[in-house]
């Protein structure tokens, strides 16, 4: 079952599934609410190398580090993670900050390793690139940051290489807008690949009609 978070009007869901049910998951996905704008959040996707307990140790070290420094600029935070994970086997990590603007919203993304991120707008997927490397193994400087605008109705997705990077998305279903966890579950069923853990995060940037619907149902 996906974990569900409401940050301002945005709905965020995360789903992490281990390769083997008896093992801890080596992927971690989290959303951290920040003080400031109506929607101001830091999103994390960490994929510990391999799977099993040692991969989980690396992923959870990433979660703890980000939780301790959520307002740090993304390049600095990535370098802090690189130091914090040196005692682990390392991880691929994606960091994304989403925030409200007068025009709608904006995202900033920094990734190292084979985590994937994209903005989904209507029928168009805008994929964001991660730079080569392993966090914990010496991250190359400077850490690149990419920015994109967000419009009402947009989606943001982050996922590990447990899902096919060539995944395609149909027209969004209304129930996904109400509960992005259903989208996470759909992606895990449809696009799982290889022998690896899965980590996926879905964030819906709502349209005004969606906000009205949620207000009527008490934020359901």
Q: What do these predicted ranges mean?
A:
Residues 44, 111, 156-158:
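Residue-level marker for buried hydrophobic side chains located in beta-strands
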